[in-house]
């Protein structure tokens, strides 16, 4: 029996790493793949527990983890390779793209007990936001720029509100410290991506128009949602494997 286990664990498996969005395949033994997987799981748990040790509720978890990312992970400078093997790669390199910020935040939020997933901009798969659920309501955060969206009651706007309200009048962009985004600090936050507030509003309006509805999200399996947030722990990965087997 021991010999059989040894043979199985020594079998080669395929590992994938993306460099500048081109996927590279290489072989590693199964035992090493399992060892690395569990090591990443422990790392996620450790990082999240440290960040959220003083968080009083789920909203504070969302903000505390997002602030930690803003302080510890930089935007990838021009000319530097984009590397992605696992979400932990982003933490190890302390560098991330827009989609990597959103993917990593969703992973860390799920480890913190907050439902979350990454959602891509329909017109550009490299641009994404994180959709999270607090108090039964799905909301949106843009962790790359550190932007949250509040309604007129100064509460995190729901997806329904984001899809229906006018960003100019009924919805306001705020920093992670709840400071309102004004025209004179657009360049400070977004760099050269936008020339003025109108460009920012147009960008987010286009994105929110295509957000999935609350019902669509609630009626979908977590494994059908975007990103890798629900497949990083051993139990969730097992559920994912079973789900794919049953679907097949």
Regions found by a protein language model. Give the residues of each.
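Hydrophobic single-pass membrane-insertion segments
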Residues: 8-15
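A structural signal for well-ordered alpha-helical scaffolds and beta->alpha junctions
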Residues: 62, 102, 182-183
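Hydrophobic membrane-insertion alpha-helices, especially the h-region
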Residues: 1-8
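Secondary-structure boundary elements
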Residues: 16-93
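Active-site neighborhood of thiol-dependent amide/isopeptide-bond enzymes
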Residues: 71-133
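His-Asp-centered catalytic microenvironments across diverse enzyme cores
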Residues: 133, 137-140, 144-248
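Loop/turn elements at helix/coil->beta-strand transitions in domains of secreted/extracellular proteins
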Residues: 57-63, 110-116, 135-138
């Amino acid at each position: 029996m021991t010999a059989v286990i040894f043979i199985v664990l020594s079998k080669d498996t395929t590992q994938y790493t993306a460099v500048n969005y081109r996927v590279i395949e290489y072989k590693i033994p199964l035992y090493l793949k399992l060892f690395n997987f569990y090591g990443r799981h422990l790392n996620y748990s450790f990082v999240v527990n440290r960040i959220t040790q003083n968080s009083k509720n789920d909203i504070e978890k969302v903000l505390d983890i997002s602030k930690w990312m803003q302080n510890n992970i930089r935007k990838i400078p021009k000319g530097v390779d984009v590397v992605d093997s696992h979400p932990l790669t982003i933490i190890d390199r302390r560098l991330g793209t827009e989609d990597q910020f959103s993917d990593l935040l969703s992973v860390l939020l799920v480890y913190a007990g907050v439902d979350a997933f990454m959602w891509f901009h329909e017109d550009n798969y490299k641009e994404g936001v994180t959709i999270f659920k607090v108090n039964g309501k799905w909301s949106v955060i843009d962790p790359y720029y550190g932007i949250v969206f509040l309604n007129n009651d100064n509460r995190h706007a729901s997806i329904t509100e984001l899809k229906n309200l006018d960003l100019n009048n009924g919805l306001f962009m705020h920093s992670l410290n709840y400071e309102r985004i004004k025209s004179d600090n657009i360049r400070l936050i977004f760099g050269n991506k936008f020339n003025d507030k109108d460009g920012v509003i147009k960008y987010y309006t286009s994105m929110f128009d295509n957000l999935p509805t609350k019902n669509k999200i609630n009626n979908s399996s977590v494994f059908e949602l975007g990103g890798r947030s629900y497949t990083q722990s051993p139990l969730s990965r097992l559920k994912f494997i079973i789900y794919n087997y049953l679907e097949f």
